[in-house]
């Protein structure tokens, strides 16, 4: 990658940091997923900055932005749009829904009905939406950042594995450090004041550049070996799918790209695997009863497969 592109990426991160203090790793992970062409699920309690992060990124990336506050009465048509009869032309006219945008914040997605969740996740997967038998393309780029409150919060219901698998990554933000929280109280740049660094067109160009990042065959085999081990691990009831393996490859390329390299290393894979695969495996009842976590199991899998040595890059 030429230095100009690396400087652009650093500028995007620096702009978002103006509104989000002390969460550099979170911001980097989100940008990695965006460059990989994926969607983001943020799983955390209210008030830690989920909406601020979404607004900051939409402004820094120069994208059209919409937000939907999910509640049980939000309908699929609120997401996809609907056809309305136009008396003047004696025809039906398409009225766009919230998904007709570049950057959609789906706030508290696990408060919505399963039917509405499915409508959004279908658009995420297909990049198209269907209304009354007609298909419409969503704008490019199309990025969904969904948030959900921890399961057990009032009015929430867990997203099924088939739906969480549509998200490239799942991350948590966590509380700020004491020092960062003091700085937040003193005042930070409003997310809406973030200056655009890119446009939708230039972001699409960077996403295409990421796809050209080189990965040697041994690293493809490494990812497949990790996936296969997850499917036969004694503590895992639902292992990694081929789609999840593809997501890990895409995230690894984007991680290398952000670091200014045009080739993937094993470290790239190991760095992104926790938040790329953490929501895609289900532990057995016995594993949960003994207090094991997905992070521990993924570490066990990583330590069980020999790490390839780069001989060509």
Regions found by a protein language model. Name each.
Residues 3, 232-313:
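C-terminal engagement/docking regions of AAA+ P-loop ATPases
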Residues 4-48:
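Pre-Walker A (pre-P-loop) alpha-helix and adjacent loop at the N terminus of AAA/AAA+ ATPase modules
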Residues 29-32, 85-105:
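Conserved alpha-helical scaffold flanking the Walker A/P-loop in AAA+ ATPase domains
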Residues 34-71:
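Walker A/P-loop
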Residues 44, 107-108, 119:
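Walker B catalytic acidic pair
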Residues 45, 79, 147:
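P-loop (Walker A) phosphate-binding loop of NTP-binding proteins
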Residues 60-88:
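AAA+/P-loop NTPase substrate/partner-engagement loops
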Residues 86-89, 112-116, 124-200, 204-213, ...:
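Canonical AAA+ ATPase core
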């Amino acid at each position: 990658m030429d230095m100009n592109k690396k400087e652009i990426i650093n500028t995007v991160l620096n702009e978002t940091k103006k509104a989000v203090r002390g969460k550099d790793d979170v911001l980097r992970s989100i940008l990695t997923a965006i460059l990989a062409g994926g969607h983001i699920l943020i799983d955390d309690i209210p008030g830690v900055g989920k909406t601020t992060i979404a607004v900051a990124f939409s402004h820094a990336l120069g994208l059209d932005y919409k937000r939907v506050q999910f509640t049980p009465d939000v309908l699929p048509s609120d997401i996809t749009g609907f056809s309305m009869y136009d008396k003047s032309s004696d025809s039906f006219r398409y009225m766009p829904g919230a998904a007709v945008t570049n950057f959609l914040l789906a706030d508290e997605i696990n408060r919505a009905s399963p039917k509405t969740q499915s409508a959004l996740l279908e658009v995420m997967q297909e990049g198209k939406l269907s209304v009354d038998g007609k298909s419409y393309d969503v704008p490019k780029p199309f990025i969904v950042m969904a948030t959900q409150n921890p399961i057990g919060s009032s009015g929430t219901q867990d997203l099924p594995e088939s739906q969480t698998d549509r998200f490239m990554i799942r991350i948590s933000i966590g509380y700020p450090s004491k020092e960062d929280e003091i700085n937040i109280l003193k005042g930070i740049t409003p997310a809406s004041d973030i200056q655009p660094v890119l446009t939708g067109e230039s972001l699409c160009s960077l996403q295409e550049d990421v796809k050209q990042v080189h990965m040697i065959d041994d690293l493809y085999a490494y990812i497949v070996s990790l996936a296969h081990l997850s499917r036969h691990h004694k503590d895992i009831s639902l292992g990694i799918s081929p789609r999840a393996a593809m997501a890990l490859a895409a995230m690894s390329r984007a991680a290398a790209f952000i670091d200014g390299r045009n080739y993937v290393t094993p470290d790239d894979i190991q760095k992104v695997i926790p938040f790329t695969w953490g929501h895609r495996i289900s532990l057995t009842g016995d594993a949960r009863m003994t207090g094991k976590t997905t992070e521990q199991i993924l570490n066990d899998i990583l330590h069980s497969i020999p790490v390839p040595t780069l001989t060509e890059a």
